[in-house]
Curated annotation (Swiss-Prot):
Catalyzes the phosphorylation of N-acetyl-D-glucosamine (GlcNAc) derived from cell-wall degradation, yielding GlcNAc-6-P. This is N-acetyl-D-glucosamine kinase. It comes from Salmonella heidelberg (strain SL476). It catalyses: N-acetyl-D-glucosamine + ATP = N-acetyl-D-glucosamine 6-phosphate + ADP + H(+). Pathway: Cell wall biogenesis; peptidoglycan recycling.
Length: 303
């Protein structure tokens, strides 16, 4: 059995998957905030319960919103303070007496989608998250590509390309990102960025769902905004896809629920790619809230 943990700031979610990659059981508990010991106990107790329930010693994979900084799995995880700066992988491997695998939640999202029954036919899968921020991951032949610093797929921290400024205007403001750089595409393509662009052009403060509702009602201003956003997304993806050249692009995060993104993006991409390039198949993520658990569990499918 494959145990996958999706760990966030508020909850620890465990999903147990069988050899056919089907979810057999799941359980959630609150994430301890103050005590590393309590955090380890919470994970270990869930593993013990799963072992007892299924009568096996399952493999353990963990997806967490942070970046392992060393080989022992020491984390930088601002949203999970109890575990940040701690050798999480090494400590859990010792306590559970098994190989614990650890990756960031965006890579687990991409891995979950790459192992979808239909998507396993594609050698190179790119996962793109358009949510509170912009992130993602790359999976090659069923294995996540992490890089030496675990930042492969941090697409949101690429800078606006010159074609974006041609589209938006060379006086378009380059906003400072939380990472400290200027002009990161996360500030324009995330859910927050979607709303910021609307306010920038129309001087109205609306959230993304409100703007999308107006678009669905046929509002001309919302329609113009969505067209501009999709053009900007295509421009920015042009650089990324030229570097990565994936077979499949899977889009997740809150904005993936807006169908125009997956249905209207493909037609905009070719003019931003090399003439010989083929645009990837574009699909909306299929596994929703279970994606983090799935991807973490499937870290052990990559042997």
């Amino acid at each position: 059995m494959y145990y996958g943990f999706d760990i966030g700031g508020t909850k620890i979610a465990l999903g147990v998957f069988d050899s056919t990659r089907r979810l057999q059981w799941e359980k959630r508990v609150p994430t301890p905030h103050a005590s590393y010991s309590a955090f380890l106990d919470a994970v270990c107790e869930l593993v013990a319960e799963a072992d007892q329930r299924f009568g096996v010693k399952g493999s353990v994979g963990i997806g967490i919103p942070g970046m392992p900084e060393t080989e022992d799995g020491t984390l930088y995880a601002a949203n999970v303070p109890a575990a940040s700066g701690k050798p999480l992988r090494a400590d859990l491997s010792a306590r559970l007496d098994r190989d614990v695998r650890l990756d960031n939640d965006a890579n687990c999202f991409a891995l979950s989608e790459a192992w979808d029954d239909e998507f396993t036919q594609y050698p190179l899968v790119m996962g793109l998250i358009l949510g509170t921020g912009v992130g993602g991951g790359l999976v090659l032949n069923g294995k996540p590509i992490t890089g030496q610093s675990y930042i492969t797929g941090e697409f949101g921290h690429m800078r606006l390309p010159v074609d974006a400024l041609t589209l938006m205007g060379f006086d378009f403001p380059l906003r400072r990102c939380g990472c400290g750089q200027m002009g990161c595409i996360e500030n324009y393509l995330s859910g927050r960025g979607f709303a910021w662009l609307y306010q920038h052009y129309y001087d109205q403060s609306l959230q993304a769902p409100e703007i999308i509702a107006l678009w669905e009602q046929g509002d001309e201003q919302a329609h113009a905004h969505v067209e501009r956003y999709l053009d900007l997304l295509a421009v920015c993806l042009g650089n990324i896809l030229t570097i990565v050249d994936p077979d499949l692009l899977v889009i997740g995060g809150g904005l993936s629920n807006f169908t125009a993104i997956t249905t209207q993006l493909a037609e905009r991409l070719p003019r931003h790619l090399l003439p010989v390039a083929r645009a990837p198949r574009i699909e909306r993520a299929r596994h929703g809230d279970a994606g983090g658990m799935r991807g973490a569990a499937f870290l052990h499918l990559t042997d």
